[in-house]
Amino acid sequence: MGGQIRIPDGIVFLNGIPVVVLEFKSAVKENTTIMDAYTQLTVRYRRDIPELFKYNAFLVISDGANNKYGSFFAPYDFFYAWRKIEADDKELDGISSLVTMVSGLFRKERLLAVLKDFIYFPDSSDRDTKIVCRYPQYFAATKLFENIKKHLKPEGDGKGGTYFGATGCGKSYTMLFLTRMLMKSPYFHSPTILLITDRTDLDDQLSKQFIASKKYIGDETVVSIDSREALRQELQGRTSGGVYLTTIQKFTEDLELLTDRTNVICISDEAHRSQINLDQKVKVTEDGVERKYGFAKYLHDSLPNATYVGFTGTPVDGTIEVFGPVVDSYTMTESVKDGITVNLVYDGRAAKVTLDQAKVKEIEDYYAQCAVEGANEHQIEESQKAVAHIDAIIGDPDRLRAVAEDFIRHYETRVSEGATVAGKAMFVCSNRKIAYDFYQIVVGLRPEWAEKKICPDGVELSDKEKKELKPIEKIKLI
């Protein structure tokens, strides 16, 4: 176009179709970088030879020492290295990462697998959205797929395996890739897949993503379940297919058998919390002994022949017992090195605790009474150790206010210095009540943080941005 010749450095053809375009720069030239290669592909070539990219799968930019790939529509920050040849290999950098990319990503059968199952387009989008898997997502999905086949009931034990992925590493896309592989595989005979979370906000996030991916998944029945009865109606009588998203709390003791089919796969997000409580709990009440099980017990009773897969950023013993051993992992160290998540740096900011003297006397009187009633010194000592961490101390109003004031000062200083990632911060409390009390104190000190806005004050937006952006508050309690 325009009478000018453009010659890309490399093109990978598949049956005559240009599926990958590569651009190379020299590592020894100080005035050129792979950022220049990115600009050349996504700006100049996009403008001058757009027909070349009609069937493009992804781009590669390289100077020999720095080697990255990514979607034609992706910003430069979303181009990543492929740092392994095989899943259990050690990650490699520098010139070695060129070998891992060529041997790991461009091996014939693997490139075909990536083209087939690991490039995602949403069903509809008002912008150019295309997601190409990263190497940890590819290895996690493929290893879980094979492990599910191995442990599928009735021949297997129904423990499809555990995936340990660092927080923020893209587990939801790994679930999406795995779901497509399961639905497209003749081996599973069009399985029914349940995606289960333990919080409504996680359920909403996954539901939005999966419902917008029906064509990619290969099943028009992708449904967010909002009640036990709706789940029963959807699953009973169904012989195959369907993707259902729900929360573990939908599974209570009044939920009867849903199906005894073996081609049912349950994928659990945050599989270290309420999704592993299979044991019976006994509680003595005024009316007698009360026996209860956790939500996970009722889930497994409702779907006795299902195969269970767990995704977690915090694997515990209970996770392994319910879902099986860790099949693949992607650690925080690896994620930071790949530029997926930011590094965590400890900055000690201990808050002094001063208790109301009335509370101190109340506690002392309690232990004196325990001794009178026959508690031995060991029992009293153990209880005193425990009370040092009770919520009455941690959630003391004076302490919470001091912590909130320090947090606000620290946060605002870091933002002004440009030391945060887009002004983001996360505050973790020991329980919901303390979190709520802390939230109320912060909002009282900074009421404007609770106001819903589409952007910070003073930031100018285009008309398009004003239409697309939705107002949100600066601080949110979850």
Label each region the model flagged:
Residues 200, 222-232, 247-253, 430-432, ...:
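Conserved helicase motor
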Residues 92, 320-422, 438-444, 450-455:
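Interdomain helical connector at the RecA1-RecA2 junction of SF1/SF2 helicase-like NTPases
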Residues 1-197, 201-217, 239, 243, ...:
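ATP-dependent helicase/translocase motor core
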Residues 22-23, 59-63, 137, 168, ...:
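Conserved structural-core and active-site-/substrate-pathway-adjacent residues in large, well-folded domains
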Residues 432-477:
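Conserved helicase motor "Helicase C" RecA-like lobe of SF1/SF2 P-loop NTPases
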Residues 226-244, 257-261, 470:
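Conserved motor-coupling elements within RecA-like helicase/translocase cores
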Residues 19, 26-29, 65-68, 200-202, ...:
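Conserved nucleotide-binding/hydrolysis micro-motifs of P-loop NTPases
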Residues 34, 80, 252-253, 259-381:
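Signature of the SF2 helicase/ATPase Hel1-core->accessory helical subdomain module
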